[in-house]
Amino acid sequence: MYNYHLLEDRDVLCIDQKSFFASVSCIEKGLDPLETKLAVVADTKRQGSVILAATPKLKELGIKTGSRLFEIPHRNDIYIINPSMRKYLNVSVAISKIALRYIPPEDLHQYSIDEFFMDVTDSYHRFSSTVHAFCERLKREIYEETGIYCTVGIGSNMLLSKIAMDVEAKHSQNGIAEWRYQDVPTKLWPIQPLRDFWGINRRTEAKLNKRGIFTIGDLAKYPYKFLKKEFGILGVDMHLHANGIDQSKVREKHKISNPSICKSQILMRDYHFDEAKVVMQELIEDVASRVRARKKVARTIHFAFGYSDEGGVHKQYTLKDPTNLEKDIYKVVMHFADKLCNKQALYRTLSISLSQFINEDERQLSLFEDEYQRKRDECLAKTIDQLHLKYGKGMVSKAVSFTEAGTKHGRLGLMAGHKM
């Protein structure tokens, strides 16, 4: 077991804006987020469109994030609207500015548009007598100035504050929960299923279940050397986290050692394989352009075709000759997709990711490739990039993007895939 007395016991807050997108949309219309049934939908004109957010009252009807537009009952008291990303960003920034009245910028970490961490160890006592009183004050100011309700997790570290917020604060009467090291056996260990714990997905859960691990307590008591043998460094992290230990600090900003450039898309309807290939080509066009903009070439390709029901196909491949050309990437993806994908299946999700970059001027010439033709391809691709940059991404498009399967032109002008 671990000796918690050797660990630093800080006052870290994890703050989540309750039903953020739906709440902002309600407030913009002068509606009460807690009493209104409202759904934010990716595209209100498409019945298969995904629900991005729902108010608590709508969730009571069984409609939640990830549901589809056609699942919403036809009722006069239900509002269905498109997202407004600019408005969401403005409100998110306003809330962060409220938090920065109390702490220096280095003590705030923006985890997502509607969630952030604050380390108030050295500052809360200047404004309130206790951490709980400080949280009440902060929640009140955010509500009074933006109309947004917040839930707050208080913890000895970032992990415990996050879990306290997710597991307890969201369901408590005052929206605040505090988890300390001494609470680990009574609050953290009973959590199950394992996938409800931060950082554990269904695949990892299945592997742990085979070893008789069903609760976080089981995981905490399991010999970490076996976890390390099976999962590597991830196994060590899981064991530490299951015991409530997280050495990361808000001030220590995480640096990505092996960045990737990726793009994914949830399709508005079920696509046949040949149609999914069109969208995959559009996604590859986008990521290849972004790699060229950084003057890089990529060595590793990872792609996924997700079926409309469950499962799908994913594959990672490392190239001998790194590239930033769409045709090279598409050729590799289709080589494996044609072999691995079920041609009779219907598809709903697609993704492509490029990684393992080197500078494009460091790429070695290949004796097995026509370098003159490659140079022409690169010049053409960069010319199209410049046209897109100057006139917009719709200036030059492949013919397939104008087919019924194409989605490129329907997504022009969107932010994060949604309307501004």
Give the role of each language-model region.
Residues H5-L7, C14, A206-Y347:
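DNA-contacting surface of Y-family translesion DNA polymerases
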Residues V24-I27, V50-A54, L160-E168, G232, ...:
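Short acidic, glycine/serine/threonine-rich loops at helix termini
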